[in-house]
Amino acid sequence: MLFRSACHPQLIFPDFDGISGKTEQIIDTFDTLRSEGHKVLIFSSFVRHLEILAEVFRQRGWKYALLTGSTNNRPSEIAHFTEQKDVQAFLISLKAGGVGLNLTQADYVFIIDPWWNPAAESQAIARAHRIGQDKQVIAYRFITQNSIEEKILQLQEDKRRLAETFITDSEALPALSNEQWADLLK
């Protein structure tokens, strides 16, 4: 519940009629990039969060593509984004878009809510970093200050450090405590 509230109040209170500070920041950043002709991949772990953004996009007349686990025609949504210049946003659920996509048309990636597993975010960002990409790709992570999202970022960093130790220093493996092993395997 804390995680959802950091994303958008409507994820907890369906009748909420306002806009969150995070959503305002996402929209403002996207609007600037859109006006400069950039294409943006927008990832969320909550389909409802993407639907909230889609509604704002519709209200502003911005064209977008949407890919979630319930998308019936995945190739059509991908083509909609990759082939149409005026479709500058691709709203993608982390689980549906984590693998098998080559979206080099995008040069910006938004992670609008952090995921517990840093590898999932890395895979999302990698959708734009593919063979054929000729532009620099910039990733933004939208984090609500003083929220559980900051704790998730710290957890991600701890997991990265443990994984790095595991991969690069075989001597350190026996030195890991039970707690460190448990954290690594979470």
Q: Where do the PLM segments sit?
A:
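Conserved Helicase C-terminal RecA-like lobe
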Residues: 1-101, 171-172, 177-186
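SF2 helicase/translocase ATPase core recognition
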Residues: 69, 88-176
